[in-house]
Regions:
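Hydrophobic core
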Residues: 13-21
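A contiguous strand-loop segment
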Residues: 26-146, 167-308
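C-terminal low-complexity, Ser/Thr- and acidic/Pro-rich disordered "stalk" regions positioned immediately N-terminal
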Residues: 524-549, 580-581
Length: 581
């Protein structure tokens, strides 16, 4: 029984260390259409998975969820926390980029981002942590709305971006939130940015088209006009809860400041480094300092003529402090070495990225197309961004491989493996792989612009009729690009074999520094545990030997006494016999 209890305790301790995935190291951007080279709205996110021993090694699948009819009582259920919400009688088709394990009961769906057939797009979520005082006043709800279910809640239902935000607000009012989160929802007319601030508080704004934003895992909204119902959607008690929590903060003009009231007192280094890097990359002359108390959400470039392209935002997601020479990505620190935190920082293009994506929303594309997603699975630093329309009704087979370990037939695992080889052998590959993708992307951008022109004059009905054609073209393009990816992977393996020998590590298990540190620590802990067990066993053995010696001594003592007793008995008897004789 005791052994069983020990085993159960160990199992429970191990289980407690396995996190339900919340993408707590994500970062995102938005660029309004007045600031882009082609007049499109741009937004995107890098989904990070920083959980050792599988940091940066977490398969994502790009899929189409068909339209579906439901009967009364059918529920959307989040297996990550028990959240449930009624399905509509009919729900729309949409795309999503799921965790490969979705639906198996282990961790939730985490659809991440997608388009629906009404032309609505979203990315969800950038996690954020509310202030402790706020959580005392308005706690998170264990089975409330969480990241894992967000895409599956919004995209099947929302016919406009505003509807998507209003739906989330309604659910938060009714069910509460399980997490602090930030989401972005767009259609071809407008884009909304929403901060989920606590168990039941939230603020969303219609994003101004003459601004850009860079945001990581914390809150950024300053003062907003709650009376402006056209451009702001907010919970009714957002100010009252801050006051109740005794954490009501104002800006220099005395106006309620949302982020200062609901967010932590200080940014974490990971949030500070990525936000600062993103803003200064977009605008090298931005009037900010690394150690500013907070960074504003909305920015205008210092140069009024500055316009941003797709390549600019790809570069933002790949950035590894190339423009900030005083900093070095912390995933380059050798395991076991001390980290100089003044030099080594967490980069936007870091080792934990599992899914990068950029959404390009063009006003002149028909609504059913939604726009274009530029999909960059695995680490953004060494993955290609590949374009797909939102209207597709199927995705290429390698996007749907659901293996948990390296699989050569998987798009995710192929590009992941390429990145791992680059990082393991920088002397062999340097920046050559990223440069190769950049060159190919130039061609894809031109091809995509021509396709956009081809479809831009269609009515919505005409656009819907092209879905099969567009899907067929997308599948062919994906097949061609995947062959290029596999060719690059094969050439890299050949180079490693030639330069490093047949016994070289081909990195099929990955090369994530955080994982290596965790593995080294686990090995160290296991060694200590083995030593402890050996010491305990030795101690127990000594104790048993001592006990045995004591027992033997006792037995010998008894025998000795018995011997003396018998001797005395015979001596006395002999004496008696002598006297009798």
């Amino acid at each position: 029984m005791r052994k069983l209890l020990v085993k159960l305790m160990i199992a429970l301790m191990a289980f407690a260390l396995i996190p339900v995935q919340v993408a707590q190291a994500c970062s995102a951007f938005i660029v309004g259409k007045e600031l882009t080279t082609d007049g499109s709205m741009l937004f995107g996110r890098t989904e990070d998975y920083p959980y050792a021993p599988d940091g940066g090694r977490h398969n994502k699948t790009y899929e189409v969820v068909p339209a579906k009819d439901y009967k009364d009582g059918d529920m959307l259920e989040d297996e990550s926390n028990g959240f449930a919400y009624p399905h509509l009688s009919h729900e729309m088709k949409y795309t999503a980029t799921y965790d490969a394990a979705h639906g198996d009961g282990s961790n939730g769906n985490f659809g991440a981002h997608g388009f629906n057939e009404a032309g609505v797009s979203m990315t969800s979520t950038v996690s954020a942590t509310p202030h402790d005082k706020i959580l005392e006043a308005d706690p998170l709800v264990k089975n409330g709305l969480a990241e894992a279910a967000m895409v599956d809640l919004v995209l099947p239902r929302a016919k406009t971006a505003r509807e998507g935000i209003e739906l989330v607000a309604k659910v938060l009012d009714e069910k509460g939130s399980a997490e602090g989160n930030i989401i972005v929802v767009a259609d071809k007319d407008e884009l909304w940015y929403m901060e989920i601030l606590s168990g039941h508080q939230y603020v969303a704004i219609k994003f101004p088209q003459d601004r850009y934003a860079i945001f990581a895992n914390t809150y950024y909204l300053g003062h907003v006009d709650f009376k402006d119902k056209e451009n702001v959607i907010a919970s009714k008690d957002v100010e009252a809860v801050a006051k109740k929590a005794d954490h009501y903060k104002t800006d220099k003009d005395g106006n309620f400041h949302i982020a200062d009231s609901y967010g932590p007192d200080e940014y974490t280094e990971r949030n500070r480094s990525r936000t600062y890097a993103g803003i200064t990359l977009m605008d090298p002359k931005a009037d900010i300092k690394y150690d500013d108390k907070h960074f504003d959400l909305l920015h205008k470039p210092t140069d009024p003529s500055k316009k941003y392209s797709l390549e600019d935002v790809f570069a933002e997601q790949r950035n590894r402090f190339e423009h900030l020479k005083q900093y070095t990505p912390d995933d380059l620190v050798e395991p076991g070495k001390e980290v100089d935190t003044n030099k080594y920082k967490y980069a936007l293009g870091n080792e934990n990225v599992i899914n990068a994506h950029v959404y390009q929303i063009k006003k002149d594309l028909p609504t059913p197309f939604g726009g274009v997603v530029w999909l960059g699975l695995a680490q953004s630093r060494n993955t290609p961004y590949v374009p797909f329309y939102g209207i597709v009704n199927d995705t290429y087979a390698p996007f749907k491989v659901r293996s948990a370990k390296y699989d050569p037939t998987s798009w995710y695992w192929a590009v992941w493996h390429i990145d791992q080889m680059v990082m393991k052998y920088p002397d062999l590959f340097g920046n050559s792989i990223q440069e190769k993708w950049k060159e190919l992307e130039k061609g894809w951008i031109k091809e995509q612009a021509a396709l956009d022109q081809k479809y831009s004059g269609l009515t919505d009905d005409q656009a819907k009729a092209t879905a099969d054609e567009v899907t067929s073209d997308s599948l062919k393009r994906a097949e061609t690009i995947f062959k290029q990816i596999k060719q690059v992977e094969s050439e890299m393996e050949d180079k490693i074999r030639t330069e490093k020998g047949l016994e070289a590590d081909f990195v099929y298990d990955g090369y994530n520094k955080a994982n290596l540190v965790a593995a080294a620590q686990a090995k160290k802990d296991a060694s200590k545990e083995t030593e402890k067990k050996e010491e305990t066993a030795s101690s127990q053995s000594s104790s048993k030997a001592s006990d045995s010696n004591s027992s033997l001594s006792a037995v010998l003592g008894v025998l000795a006494l018995a011997g003396f007793g018998l001797a005395g008995f015979y001596f006395k008897k002999s004496k008696k016999n002598e006297n009798e004789e």
